[in-house]
């Protein structure tokens, strides 16, 4: 493993997660990795009949609600299936690119969508004393795993942060027309991410598990870039420094949002205009 000098991201964890092969419907290796990792850390770990994984760390303050992180365990990279069946790890390559570090595989498709999101979520969880995380199967099949979850698990959750968007400087304002937050929440907590952390734009996302959570719970939901590029292609790669920034962003947001419940009614809310959600880091 090449040492990269990242600021907050656990580099071993990052490489370990990215080397685990996964494919839609064949998430067993990734599930086993997350479960073993969580048990080693002393987290409460549960799975359901779908194969989704639920983690809880720490004890809430009285009257508090958990921050929750989420990502999905499957990828679209079919060439990873032989590695799954033969219990082998993906051979990772690291090279410098424009002063940063690009992580990829030669010809197998990295599957950073959404293994990078898993690594970022677990990296944030390491840094937080109290946190929940859920990792879903079969997102690429139409969010099948998240649709089958038991949403009573979210009753003590205050808000949900997903990492299932490309690059670092992009985030979702909506998914398939489901608005993830309202203008008041954006102005109070998200607008500052541009000048403080370099998040440059929000956009309309086609679909991901966070829209299912938003629809079922009414909680404020967010979806941020996990540092992957060229997703769903054989040339997919991750930028380690962007994953590092994604961890920093999550830590910052959880400290800002606290252990309170941020509920935003779905009914009557309209999608925010794109122009209201575009801003630059030097604004």
Predicted regions: what they are:
Residues 2-25, 232:
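N-terminal capping segment at the start of a domain
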Residues 230-283:
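His/Asp/Glu-rich mid-to-C-terminal helical/loop segments that flank catalytic regions of hydrolases
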Residues 46, 197-204, 258-268:
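Flexible, glycine/charged-enriched surface loops at secondary-structure junctions
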Residues 34, 38, 118-125, 213, ...:
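Buried hydrophobic packing segments
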Residues 63-130, 157:
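Active-site metal-coordination/substrate-binding segment of hydrolases
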Residues 201-246:
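Zn-dependent metallopeptidase/amidohydrolase metal-coordination segment
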Residues 104-184, 202:
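Acidic/histidine-rich catalytic neighborhood of metal-dependent amide-processing enzymes
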Residues 13-16, 22-65:
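A non-catalytic alpha/beta surface segment that caps or lines the substrate-entry region
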